[in-house]
């Protein structure tokens, strides 16, 4: 399998050099070329044929937004990962980029750390590998592999074939009680999530009987804009969760970046609790924290869904949801950008059914109505 070719687009020579070092140090990646703005990047596209693009937002002559608009206009389908500032205005522009077709984003370290990309180098490397490999496979240009996703984790410095998941444990967990009716839907998702959730929520039925609570791994300052962007395309209300928000049908609550989201059933209603405790499974918000609270409060009356993402956050407690008697779904390998979280959940025996991204909204609508 050939190396993934990365086009680096940033007006800062220092940043181009730093990103280039990350690419050079990552087995399976190679620099296709570098460009100082969107206009030069467009001129290079046909010649260098990148598999993935790293794009800065603020550049002279043609900025990141203008570059993405031009890609869309010319129907050029190359995955783009945005390098975004953490400033509030950066969050709005980043969400605009996702709406224009960017695949994902990563935040630059701020202030005195702005020139130190080592804090995000591993995440950036894995994103570029995942999106670049997927592009190679979908275009059929450099790979004969039939798997669309990038399987987590790496276990050596040599890029592994993207193998299928291990079979489920022979001794699967046993539900402690029969499935009850579904009263809440909980979704955990990470890398590949922004576009996946856009696709799913655009097709959710407006009369879905259950509320939805979501953890999407995302830094502080971005989840509010992310929720607003989803709200534009979803028939249901989508908002960033605030402490005390009612959990009710017709509403989707997104965990705020940098905080955990848990659910709490009271005598007359269920409410969201936003808590500021330590990261769990390496994340904050954590899917495991949300799923654990849903398992505790709803037992066998939930639908848990674990989707594309690196690592294993959510795998442990979606298995707990399953043993409590709730129904569970995992995104399948073929449609996951990174088959990490859903793979571990499947191998642990915590997932009843694997569903493709294209069929996920229909599955949610079907489960929600059939088992209301």
Swiss-Prot record:
Domain of life: Bacteria
Polar residues composition bias: residue spans: 140-151
Catalytic activity: [protein]-L-glutamate 5-O-methyl ester + H2O = L-glutamyl-[protein] + methanol + H(+); L-glutaminyl-[protein] + H2O = L-glutamyl-[protein] + NH4(+)
Sections of the chain in a coiled coil: none
A Gene Ontology biological process term: chemotaxis
UniProt keyword Phosphoprotein, yes or no: yes
Keywords for this protein: Chemotaxis, Cytoplasm, Hydrolase, Phosphoprotein
Catalytic residues identified in the record: 190, 217, 313
A GO CC term attached to the entry: cytoplasm
Range of residues in the leader sequence: none
Top EC class for this record: hydrolase
Post-translational events: Phosphorylated by CheA. Phosphorylation of the N-terminal regulatory domain activates the methylesterase activity.
Annotated spans, Disordered: 140-177
Residue ranges annotated for the Response regulatory domain, each copy included: 5-123
Role: Involved in chemotaxis. Part of a chemotaxis signal transduction system that modulates chemotaxis in response to various stimuli. Catalyzes the demethylation of specific methylglutamate residues introduced into the chemoreceptors (methyl-accepting chemotaxis proteins or MCP) by CheR. Also mediates the irreversible deamidation of specific glutamine residues to glutamic acid.
Domain remarks in the Swiss-Prot or TrEMBL record: Contains a C-terminal catalytic domain, and an N-terminal region which modulates catalytic activity.
Name of this chain's protein: Protein-glutamate methylesterase/protein-glutamine glutaminase
Organism: Treponema denticola (strain ATCC 35405 / DSM 14222 / CIP 103919 / JCM 8153 / KCTC 15104)
